């Protein structure tokens, strides 16, 4: 493949692309293109634009575990390490490597802002209607150009052609990414020990020409973006056509050995059987769950009434209310007879404002 030299180091590109413009560089993920132009404009300008699109930011959400990440520049490196910014730092950071750190939420916000040209922020649906976001001072033609380039990643001669939606009227746009974990001298990133494999990333939005949803998928040690974009494809398929999305899920579940609930039940039963116990099957319908909860509540109420009656009677007088017997002690080898845990539903990607 191609690449670019910086000092005594040569930075590779994963392939040779020939003559490249921005559209082709985005669609085919040409690292050399971004190496060149980051050095041409200076990385401080690149870092400023990354911050504008949500990198390194905290959002107004009721969670304490947000990860700020890092958008490096010359001032940041000087403050943190006491060393100047070098040309090879620009090359590394131009494709998100080196000191760059980002969270999946930040990547999803980046995707939404790129798609719309507006300063969209994530919010909880129950917070009510979203405020009108500020529009960036971008030319409409520039926004349309980026949308088309990211559409070509999926629907053209790009790096995520297998991410095309099975929907004739909806096209998804995206960008593949690979976060290198260790040096290529240790691992090629695609195989070998799991801990040395690259992380797979994919940011996306759809429909590409009138965005409604945007999101990001990160698969740690997935070996590259090929582990990430099929998930984005299936999620977006479900959002636009739930029936078709569930059909794709059922085909996968057959390979996995059943639904998530069925696999959990099988593992739970095997765990109990290994300890000489059995488990009752969990309720199958909402009505059964409600009936079970109400029965337990009635039993608890009767026990409370019996205890209260005994407490107010004179000493020596026995209660006419029979207290239900305490449950027998569970043998040490018996597993709790509780329903198998329910599967957790997948997260839904943030909704953008067209």
Model-derived regions, located:
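Short, gly/Ser/Thr-rich active-site loops of penicillin-recognizing serine hydrolases
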Residues: 130-134, 147-148, 229-315
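N-terminal non-cleavable signal-anchor helices
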Residues: 72, 253, 280, 294, ...
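Long, low-complexity, intrinsically disordered segments
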Residues: 304-354
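Intrinsically disordered, low-complexity acidic/polar segments
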Residues: 212, 224-226
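A generic structural motif
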Residues: 219-223
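Short amphipathic alpha-helical face segments that pack within enzyme cores
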Residues: 103-109, 227-234
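Beta-lactam-recognizing serine transpeptidase/beta-lactamase-like catalytic domain environment
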Residues: 1-217, 267-275, 299, 309-319, ...
């Amino acid at each position: 493949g191609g690449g670019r030299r910086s000092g005594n180091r040569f930075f590779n590109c994963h392939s040779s692309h020939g003559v490249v413009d921005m559209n082709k560089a985005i669609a085919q993920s040409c690292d050399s293109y971004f190496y060149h132009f980051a050095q041409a404009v200076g990385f401080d300008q690149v870092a400023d634009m990354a911050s504008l699109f949500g990198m390194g930011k905290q959002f107004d959400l009721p969670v304490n575990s947000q990860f700020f990440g890092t958008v490096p520049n010359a001032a940041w490196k000087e403050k943190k390490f006491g060393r100047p910014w070098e040309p090879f730092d620009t090359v590394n950071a131009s494709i998100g490597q080196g000191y760059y750190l980002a969270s999946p939420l930040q990547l999803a916000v980046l995707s939404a802002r790129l798609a719309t040209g507006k300063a969209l922020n994530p919010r909880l649906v129950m917070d009510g209607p979203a405020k009108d976001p500020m529009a960036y001072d971008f030319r409409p033609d520039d926004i349309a150009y980026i949308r088309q380039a990211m559409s070509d990643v999926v629907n053209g001669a790009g790096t995520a052609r297998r991410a095309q939606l099975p929907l004739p009227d909806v096209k998804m746009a995206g960008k593949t990414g690979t976060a290198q974990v260790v040096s290529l001298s240790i691992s090629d990133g695609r195989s070998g020990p799991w801990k040395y494999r690259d992380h797979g990333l994919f940011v996306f939005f759809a429909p590409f020409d009138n965005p409604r949803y945007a999101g990001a998928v990160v698969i740690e040690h997935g070996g590259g973006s090929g582990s990430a974009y099929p998930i984005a494809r299936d999620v977006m398929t479900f959002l636009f056509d739930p029936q078709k999305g569930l059909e794709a899920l059922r085909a996968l579940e057959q390979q996995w050995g059943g639904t998530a609930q069925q696999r959990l039940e099988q593992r739970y039963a095997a765990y109990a059987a290994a300890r000489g116990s059995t488990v009752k099957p969990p309720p199958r319908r909402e009505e059964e769950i409600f009936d079970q909860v109400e029965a337990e509540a009635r039993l608890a109420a009767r026990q409370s009434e019996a205890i209260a009656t005994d407490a107010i009677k004179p000493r020596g007088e026995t209660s006419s209310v029979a207290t239900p017997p305490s449950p027998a002690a569970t043998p040490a080898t018996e597993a709790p007879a509780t329903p198998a845990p329910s599967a957790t539903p997948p997260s839904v990607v943030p909704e953008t404002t067209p």
